[in-house]
UniProtKB/Swiss-Prot annotation:
It comes from Pseudomonas fluorescens (strain SBW25). The lineage of its organism: Bacteria, Pseudomonadati, Pseudomonadota, Gammaproteobacteria, Pseudomonadales. The gene is rplA. Pfam families: Ribosomal_L1 (PF00687). This is Large ribosomal subunit protein uL1. GO terms for cellular component: cytosolic large ribosomal subunit. Keywords: Repressor, Ribonucleoprotein, Ribosomal protein, RNA-binding, rRNA-binding, Translation regulation, tRNA-binding. Part of the 50S ribosomal subunit.
Amino acid sequence: MAKLTKRQKAIAGKIEAGKAYNFVDAAALLTELSTVKFSESVDVAVNLGVDPRKSDQVVRSATVLPHGTGKTVRVAVFTQGPAAEAALAAGADRVGMDDLAAEMKGGDLNYDVVIASPDAMRVVGQLGQILGPRGLMPNPKVGTVTPDVATAVKNAKAGQVRYRTDKNGIIHTSVGKVGFDAVKLKENVEALIADLKRIKPASSKGIYVKRVTLSTTMGPGLVIDQGSLDV
């Protein structure tokens, strides 16, 4: 069995095994335990009462967090005409059609979000093997295939997070940075859970939000007392 590092021992000594933490207390503890030299992301994992093997119980969507994620988001948009002008005005970093596709085929993939208008999917369809594995393929279910590309760009820049249940029925996403005020982190998580409840699959039975766990990039996961969340 591998030995714990000095940092791991220090962290383990401050965490109560089996405890469900008040959200604000958990956020404060994660900040205290963050000793790395970069600004860590604060992530949440939500265990849902779904069977991900059933297609009608796969939860996939996007939520605009009220306080964003603290990350600078680069957005590329496939569209043309007036929609292209609107996308640029909304803050898109790159807008194009075949020219943008050629750049991506050449390896220029320095984007966090790729958006497309429906008429551009004939071009985007060629990029499935490039964008798909990177989680960048536009999809109407998360609002990245839309005629209103300007709003999609604004949402992405404002800190919209996209998520999908994994094979264990858990969604994972970033909800901010260690430097965020605990109340802002809490409101971001509450917005996410409210959205998850809104899109609850009709066939899901029993407890839907089973567990909420908060963590940092390099830190431990703390189970949250859901009674401390206003959802």
